[in-house]
Amino acid sequence: MTLDISKYPTLALANTPEELRLLPKETLPTLCDELRTYLLNSVSQSSGHLASGLGTVELTVALHYVYNTPVDQLIWDVGHQAYPHKILTGRRDQMPTIRQKDGLHPFPWREESEYDTLSVGHSSTSISAGLGMAISAQKEGEGRKVVSVIGDGAITAGMAFEAMNHAGDVHPDMLVILNDNEMSISENVGALNNHLAKVLSGSLYTSIREGGKKVLSGVPPIKELVRRTEEHLKGMVVPGTLFEELGFNYIGPIDGHDVNELVKTLKNMRELKGPQFLHIMTKKGKGYEPAEKDPIGYHAVPKFAPSNNSLPKSSGGKPNFSKIFGDFLCDMAAQDPKLMAITPAMREGSGMVRFSKEYPEQYFDVAIAEQHAVTLATGMAIAGDHPIVAIYSTFLQRGYDQLIHDVAIMDLPVMFAIDRAGLVGADGQTHQGAFDLSFMRCIPNMVIMAPSDENECRQMLYTGHKHTGPSAVRYPRGSGMGTDIEKDFTALEIGKGRIVRKGEKVAILSFGTFLGNALEAAENLNATVADMRFVKPLDEALIRQLAAEHDVLVTLEENAIAGGAGAGVIEFMMQDKIIKPVLNLGLPDRFVPQGTQDELHEDLGLDAKGIEKSINDYLAK
């Protein structure tokens, strides 16, 4: 699938930033229109992130037009909004492959392009990294400029403010751009603020401001009065006082969809010294009405026909694990008014929309603040409530200290509902849930469960909710197996697995939703299969039994082999002096790139055929 570039004559002239900078300024609005249309037509045929990129077209064009990329370093926070950047940096013809196996990476990726300064995927890292680059550039005496682009969601994270606080202290030359598409200050956008932005970033204003500071620097009270007067005058028309207090020169807010005004302002700001902050207002989904009306729905899209003005409806079928969790929350909250559900900005992805509407007083979206989410749950547990933290496996990494220090050490009853455990597919290395078993298994007091199907997931969530200490239930992205779901809740016995198939010689110890693959592989092998259920505590009696009755044990998990469930089995066997060959199957010691889940499982030998082959190869040694 390729798009006919002849239908985009101006875009055809700007395959790289060098070519873009040769275009007359008068052509930039036309370029933006073509780029936006190209993006819509491309993503609708390939699937991928759409609404964010539609909102950053003008900003992307202006940045590459003004800044000498890749010498000047441009950092996109998270990276959802970077599709226009990829199109303008020599990857236009590869866009149909984005998020696909062996295709373009879904986010800016250093290995992919010299224009991708920082590999990203998680939020709120851009200002810290940009500050480091700016400090190094200043130390080396280079004229290199650094720009960090961050959204109004990502800037709420503590890490972003930690970086700005530090930048205000060390005062390097850098620019932070806030891409604001939600805040209530949108009414400030208009001719007055665009004019103010040009004035505040212009050389006359800057020279007067800096000259005045030098003249009055020996008179501290007057210097302070001048500073505060300047802030208050600006604060009358712009909401920049907070960023000024952090040590930034605040400009804006300005219209982020007026490419020529952006170019003027950026040219002025590129020459300024010290930390600069540009606040732009944009509309997520800009230029495609359905995405403007439903930016959340069009954030990440499947293949669709833009002319239909709608996304294809789900075919229904088996419920996904996120829905299983959402239904559990609603059913459990009906019985337990002390249930408190917490999410760090993942309401839709975690299946919590219905719960947030039916139980708004028991629902807490803390924004992108994983550390706070975990310790908030700590406070609720101490107060006698029953908190549940709904979080993706990859994002729990960001709250690890709090998990240990604020939950596990005090043995508090906080349950972690860990979604996207294992390989998530198209989002690649930064989003694979490969490590949660490894980093949780070493924490004292933790109970860790890995369900094999939808009903087991529901009952494990109930088990964790009723447990008197910290617990975690980890489940994968996507649909279940079609298992019948019991409406009634049944608490499982902690640390007990079950044998689901009796065989000979080989026993497969399955942790999680690979159970179906294990059973299929076991048919030709005539192997025993156990659904272990608990990663911690392990069912030690069952391991002893399986070791005594079989020649070889095989552990199977969708987690890194290093430190995972299989490693726990071997540790126990060595401590118990059980000497039997053990084959660990799981994720390898490398970061797994994007692809569909099925493609990745096949590549890694974790589908039924791969499991059977690995076991036969091991037996043949």
Curated annotation (Swiss-Prot):
Keyword Lyase part of the UniProt annotation: no
PROSITE patterns, sorted: TRANSKETOLASE_1, TRANSKETOLASE_2
Cofactor: binding details: Binds 1 Mg(2+) ion per subunit.
Pathway: Metabolic intermediate biosynthesis; 1-deoxy-D-xylulose 5-phosphate biosynthesis; 1-deoxy-D-xylulose 5-phosphate from D-glyceraldehyde 3-phosphate and pyruvate: step 1/1
Pfam families found in the cross-reference section: DXP_synthase_N, Transket_pyr, Transketolase_C
Entry binding sites for Mg(2+): 152, 181
InterPro entries, per database record: Dxylulose-5-P_synthase, THDP-binding, Transketo_C/PFOR_II, Transketolase-like_Pyr-bd, Transketolase_BS, Transketolase_C, Transketolase_CS
Membrane spanning stretches: none
A biological process from GO: isopentenyl diphosphate biosynthetic process, methylerythritol 4-phosphate pathway
MF GO annotations: 1-deoxy-D-xylulose-5-phosphate synthase activity; magnesium ion binding; thiamine pyrophosphate binding
Superkingdom of the organism of origin: Bacteria
EC number: 2.2.1.7
Chain positions recorded as thiamine diphosphate binding sites: 80, 121-123, 153-154, 181, 288, 370
Reaction it catalyzes: D-glyceraldehyde 3-phosphate + pyruvate + H(+) = 1-deoxy-D-xylulose 5-phosphate + CO2
Top-level class of the enzyme under EC nomenclature: transferase
UniProt entry keywords in alphabetical sequence: Isoprene biosynthesis, Magnesium, Metal-binding, Thiamine biosynthesis, Thiamine pyrophosphate, Transferase
Required cofactor(s): Mg(2+); thiamine diphosphate
Record GO cellular component, one term: cytosol
Database matches in HAMAP family: DXP_synth
Function statement: Catalyzes the acyloin condensation reaction between C atoms 2 and 3 of pyruvate and glyceraldehyde 3-phosphate to yield 1-deoxy-D-xylulose-5-phosphate (DXP).
Known partners and oligomeric status: Homodimer.
Family: Belongs to the transketolase family. DXPS subfamily.
Annotated protein name in UniProt: 1-deoxy-D-xylulose-5-phosphate synthase
Gene designation: dxs
